């Protein structure tokens, strides 16, 4: 492995994940890899605060989930260390009632986040389901960047 490789696994629910050491958290964050999510991160409000992300209360972004359910998220901006590189990114932040938050956190045993294709844009992602292994490797050759920004707007190349 090289310094910019991240190894992970497949959990019992067949979800690819990696563990990320992150300032502000005692234990590594469990980051589920979601190639159907074209943003960088999906986090909750508490995680956004611990990551010191700036979340604008009026920055509501409607999103249609893979389940076809519509949900609103806030947008938060901050600095995140990804594969040894500090990046300024925009995260989707869950909007939850206190009851929803309690129910979700009761189901978790660890801090969980979702990483999407915006973070994976300059990476090679290998998922080996039979071996239950995940490998994310940073590609050394520079790529110009994703053809869309973090909220799905077309970029000119």
Could you tell me what each predicted segment is?
Residues 1-157:
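Pepsin/retropepsin-fold aspartyl endopeptidases
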């Amino acid at each position: 492995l090289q310094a910019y490789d991240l190894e992970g696994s497949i959990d019992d629910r067949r979800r690819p994940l990696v563990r990320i050491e992150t300032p502000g958290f005692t234990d590594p964050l469990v980051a589920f890899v979601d190639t159907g999510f074209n943003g960088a991160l999906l986090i909750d409000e508490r995680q956004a605060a611990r990551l010191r992300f700036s979340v604008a209360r009026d920055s509501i972004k409607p999103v249609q989930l893979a389940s076809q359910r519509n949900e609103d998220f806030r947008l938060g901006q901050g600095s995140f260390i990804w594969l040894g590189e500090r990046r300024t990114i925009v995260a989707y932040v869950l909007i939850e009632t206190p009851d929803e938050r309690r129910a979700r956190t009761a189901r978790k045993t660890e801090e969980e986040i979702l990483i999407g294709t915006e973070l994976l844009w300059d990476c090679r992602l290998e998922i080996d389901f039979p071996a239950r292994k995940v490998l994310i490797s940073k590609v050394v050759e520079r790529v110009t960047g994703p053809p869309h920004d973090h909220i799905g707007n077309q970029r000119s190349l």
